[in-house]
Amino acid sequence: MVREDLILGIETSCDDTGVSIIKTSIARDNPEEINLDILSNKLASQTELHDKYGGVVPELASREHLRSLLPLTKQALFESDLDPSCLSKIAVTTGPGLKGSLLTGLNFSAGLAAALKKPLIPINHLEGHVLSAFIESKSSPRRNFPFLTLLISGGHTQIILARSEEHTSELQSPMYLVCRL
């Protein structure tokens, strides 16, 4: 027997708006084997807008997310040939990131989850980077925990210990080590 989930993912941690729908299939007798299909992956870039100002303007980023979220979600559902009621869960980035951008994505996702009576799954942006190695192909690679990874993303540089999918922790920030020298 296989458990399937259709998950809508919302990403608004900085200046790009991302909406994706994935289908996961997990064999009940072998939960280590997860098959993933990316049904839709939509992105609205704000690079051109922010380039005029020499960098990301948080208030503009939040407004652009607000303009982009509903159309991108509709496009993702259409491209996936899904009715919103078919979704199993809604996942949303909850940090770290720009507060206004995160709140825009969270409020949109929470409203959608409440309207559809679906669970809302908070996602740590940095943990998403760490675990993204497992979704590079339709059949995800075997998860060999624990593992160490060096994470460099935006203003974050960290050495992360991943004990499991649910348990990751920062061992040390290389910047902290440099400052101590």
Place the predicted regions along the sequence by residue.
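Short acidic/glycine-rich loops and adjacent helix/strand connectors
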Residues: M1-S169
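Single conserved hydrophobic/aromatic residue that forms the stacking wall/gate
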Residues: E165-L181
